[in-house]
Amino acid sequence: MFDLDGTLIAWDCQLLFRHFVLRREPWRGIFLPVFLAFLPLAGLLGAGGMKRVFLSYLWRMDLEVLAEYSREFAASLMPSIYPELRAKLEAQRAAGDFLILASASPEFYAAEIGRELGFDLTLGTPVELGEFFPDLENHKGAAKVARLIEVLPAAWFENGKLGNCHGYTDSCAGLPMLEIGPNYYADIEA
């Protein structure tokens, strides 16, 4: 299992994707003041609520356009993937391991990044566009674990642990994901 932001790539992909979209549709920059206006409410809204506000720049975007941007964005990130983590990914693929990308990033582009890197399964935050503030369930921390348990075969788990699993993250938010596997690697700075 691999985390994405800060683990496979140095940056927060949400910011990178927003910049990617704004270079193609600069008018969407008008939504930045909306996000800034909600910043004082971040403690009340939480990470999921703020993610909904942040993603307002995608309001009324055609889903086919979003899919195309997601594919182009994923391809553009490939040179930025940490070589050391790419080597670990390739070694695990060569060993026949089932490769999982589990990210809190929106699934519409996380899935494309996973496809580019050859993951067997990619899970991100499912986002339903349409409303000004899109609906989503933030795929972070314990929510990642719940979704992994939901989608992976029950036979892969023993006593709540995912057998023969290796996990990689750079974030404390990824610790619940790592705790379901017996072998994990966290590079977390306090």
Feature names for model-found ranges:
Residues M50-P83:
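Metal-dependent phosphoesterase signature
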Residues A75-A190:
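C-terminal cap/substrate-recognition subdomain and adjoining C-terminal extension
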Residues M1-L45:
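Active-site neighborhood of HAD-like aspartate-dependent phosphohydrolases
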Residues P33, A37-L63, L121-T122:
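Short, compositionally biased "basic patch" segments
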